[in-house]
Amino acid sequence: MMDPPSFSRRAPSTQLSHPILGCDSIQSWKCDYMPTSHVAPKTLDEYISAFSPEVQAVLQRVRQAVCSAAPGAQETISDRIPAFRLNGMLVYFAAFTKHIGFYPPIRGDSRLEKAVSRYAGEKGNLRFPLDQPIPYGLIKRITRLRVKQNRAKHTTERKKK
């Protein structure tokens, strides 16, 4: 059995921007989970196994919340973080030192936008602090909204063809 990849913080650079997380600098997103060997995790299990047992438990529950809200969604790794596809990219999540990040920003449902506002980061992406209860029910609501949005977009694109 292979050892999990080595993860550590990288030196800052302002020349790159993360396409999903929406950060202005690479310093913001190349955090503790980024492999120093430049080898990205290939599966969600591999990604999750690199963390402490406490964080692994949280990540597994986030994964379960997404799976239950989006039956049939395909697990993948995109930009070195866990992601789900269903009629296109659905949601992403990542573990950081003090929080779980959940992406993309929520748009299109004012009630849900209000519900997530306390967790909104600078770019509208969500940050769930690890020292507070993780709102798994809210993660399910967000995922269901994204399923609905992706389905509508997919249907519209198919009609154009």
Describe the residue ranges of each PLM region.
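Extreme N-terminal basic, low-complexity initiation segments
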Residues: 1-14
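Charge-dense, helix-prone N-terminal extensions
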Residues: 18-161
